Every structure is written in structure tokens, then in C-alpha cells.
Amino acid sequence: IYTYIGLVLFLTGANIGFMPAGNYLGQVLAGQNWRWIILPIGMLIGYFIVKAEPAVYVLNKQVEEVTDGAISAGTMGAALSAGVSLSVGLAMVRVLTGISILWFLIPGYAFAIGISFVVPKLYTAIAFDAGGVASGPMTAAFLLPLAQGACVAVGGKIVTDAFGVVAMVAMTPLITVQLMGLTAQLKQRRARQEQPLPAAPPAFADLPDDAIIEL
């Protein structure tokens, strides 16, 4: 019963609140003379909207618990926010320019798969889970209508230019989380290299002059 009530409330809010608001905001921002303003504003919205995803909060807590704090929830949240912000920025570039989504998806996924061979497997697994979690209901209910409204304002093709936001949001966390893992790996390697070697035990320096040395 609680699940049913929650779904009804969420879908009602999405249809009445989130989707019309996102569509209207996209039309207003992209309809101005300085339509490129939607690029930084969209990135800012993408940075903070991922923090409202319940699944993201759960994933961050689980990662922190499983790794015993080695990967904190704050670090995971920052990596996901940066990834979603980047994806929304690229989506707005597509809306304004009409560039095909394949120019972003193919290099993005190729880079994500390529870097997975040098990143610790833990970060790779977390990254792929994070990609699915970040592209949750808030993305479909607000960011997609935002792109659709902007596309209408600039006179673009909604089907080819606006759709694909969810795919972009699912892709970028694969890159940002794995880059976070690569950075952590390089820091650990540098710390081991800079760690001083233990001093060698003295051989004969501390022996008295009349000591007998047995060979």
C-alpha cells in the first residue's frame, strides 16, 4: 500500500510539477537572445539534481560501508554530480547545434571501456552501477523536458536533438568514477614510492674496540 501511494504521489508530482516546469524553463532560457545561457544553467541544474535521487543516496552509503570508508559517500556524490553536470552540458550543446548523439556516445563508451583495463576492478563495478543509478526518475522527469523545451525554443528536432539525455547521463558517471579510481591508484603508488626505506641495522659501528667477532 505504501509503495502504491508513493508511486501515485511521485507520478502526480512528475506530471503536474516537474515535467511542465522543466519544459517551460527550457523554452524560456533557450528563447532569449543569449540562448547559450542554457549551457551553464543546465550544467548547474544537473550538478544538484543528482543529489535529489534517492537511489544515488543509497548507492553512496552502500559504497562507503562496503569499502570501510575508503570511498566516502561525499567523494562518490561529487563524482556523480560532476558526471551528470557534464552530460547535461553536452546535451545542451546537442540541442543548440544539432550534433548527432553518436559523436558523444561512441567516444564516451570507448573511453570508459578502455580505461577499465587500468582502473581497479572495484571502481569499474561501482562506475557501471552508478551510471544506471544516476539516470533515475529525476532525469527523466525534469532534465529530459528541459532539453525538449530548449529544443522547441531554438527550432530544432525534438526526436533527434532533445532525446538522448538519459543515455548521456548514464554514460558520464562511467568516466568520472573510473577517473576517480585512477587518481586514487596513482596517489597510492606515489605515496609508496616516496615512503622512506627502513634504516639498515648497524653492523660493526656500535661494537667496542676489544670485541671478538666470530666469522
Which residues does each predicted region cover?
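Helix-loop-helix junctions within the multi-pass membrane cores of secondary transporters/permeases
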Residues: 36-116
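Intrinsically disordered, low-complexity non-transmembrane regions of multi-pass membrane transporters
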Residues: 62-70, 182-215
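Hydrophobic alpha-helical transmembrane segments in multi-pass integral membrane proteins
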Residues: 12-17, 140-157
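Membrane-helix cytosolic exit motif
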Residues: 163, 167-192
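Hydrophobic alpha-helical segments of multi-pass membrane transport proteins
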Residues: 105-126, 175-181
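Alpha-helical transmembrane segments
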Residues: 61-69, 116-131, 188
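Transmembrane alpha-helix boundary signature
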Residues: 10-24, 50-55
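Transmembrane helix-loop boundary segments of multi-pass membrane transporters
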Residues: 13, 31, 90-113, 126-135, ...
